Amino acid sequence: MTNSLTTWDEPELAIDWARLGHVYVVGNGKGGVGKTTTSAHIAALVASDGARTLLIDLNGQGNCALLLGFANTERDDKGRNLFSAVTAGAQLTPVRNVRPNLDVVPGGQYVRRIASVLSAEMATKDDAKRVHLALAECLQAIAGDYRVIIIDTPPENPLLSNIALCAGRFVIVPMRTDEYSRQGLRDIAADIRGMREHNPYLMLLAVFVFGSGTSSKKIRREMAKSVSEDLGQSSDMLLESFVRHAESVASEMVKFGRLAYELEQEIENNPKYWEVRKGSAKNVTTVSETSRLVAEDFANLAAEVLTRAASKRAQMIEQGEWP
């Protein structure tokens, strides 16, 4: 409270945490571990089951639009609305029905400006709190329209990642089986602890391996032990589900703007090899058969994540800890 006649207190933010209990943040302090691919797949798979879903691309590259096939179209605002919402309190206006039941708030070049704008507004502790809760404040206004909300976070941009954490309930961490990913896990674990000052209900839900060989079972078992050591928690934090390495599928997803399960549906349209050889094939575009297996990986992952979240929610409700 101030007694000055020429200044006034900024109104204290009122975050209704009950509205944000279905927000999932996909993050890791390291890039190249599958955050965007995972975010897009979980969001689209949930939507395909009939649940209204929102995907927020808090990333300056805007790759969610690329994966979903609407990059560089009139629907892709390159993050302009997200920038206005987070920095100026504008209403979030998602792109509707990018897939049936799936809305998207695109990222892109305007998102890159968010951190520099907000960094200049963190002079006091109260200012810092307001900045960190900027996404939570604008998201809570539309959160009730959706059953699930997924936030894709950027690598190596602590402020944007922390803004996402302050709007989320559950954190999902993809990682590869290398030391760089382990450091990224330790970094985001520290961020989660720090951001609980602003978001007391934030929790690490699960860790999973992305881009692993199907025969690398021993490596994944060792990774489970490493995750337990890094987090100081039980080794079941690492999910059984993992996403296999499939370079051809990753390339085709970007090339065609289709997710793995959508590519799978096109396999039956692949031309026969003898038709291609004879030059009689009507369709010369082929889709990797491996897309079927990758689609199954993501379906298993999404199911395990949602089951674990539901179990955690039920446990907290029983204990009187869920807002």
List where the protein language model places each region.
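P-loop NTP-binding core
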Residues: 1-323
